[in-house]
Amino acid sequence: MKKMRDIICLLLALTFFGSLAFGEVNTEKANEAFSRGLEAYSDKRFLEAINWYTTATSFGHLGAPSFIGHLYVDGEGVSKNLTLAYMWYQIGAAAGFKDSEENRDRIARVMDQDSILLAKKKAKICIESLYETCK
């Protein structure tokens, strides 16, 4: 449990300082939404966690998209869906979050090209809709 807490604290610090580099970020709201997502995840309220992580992403939290991607890879609270996982990792990678980039590239090795293209299209739509259309 302590190791998990340390990892979460490290991710929070990395995303906080990474978010500062992007300017148009509401760090306080992003971190609050992300923390609520972590609480929901800890309580196994996975759909609520996704909603909070999406809100955190909309406020500029760099790590939140990776957490959503992990839920889709593992099928926690949602059906396993590598296309949606790739979409969320792509969103994080586009913002400069290294974990998202690494995870996106990892799952791409087991995806077909059509699914990857669809995921990229979905990521673009999600970002352009300000995270309202992310399915």
Residues of each region from the PLM?
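Bacterial N-terminal signal peptides
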Residues: 9-19
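Short coil/turn and helix-start
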Residues: 24-26, 42-46, 58-59, 72-80, ...
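Terminal, low-structured helical/coil segments at or just beyond the last alpha-helical repeat
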Residues: 26, 30, 101-135
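Hydrophobic face of amphipathic alpha-helices that form TPR/SEL1-like repeat modules
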Residues: 31-42, 65-74, 105-108
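TPR/TPR-like alpha-solenoid repeats
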Residues: 56, 71, 92, 107-110, ...
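TPR alpha-solenoid repeat register
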Residues: 64-66, 78, 100-102
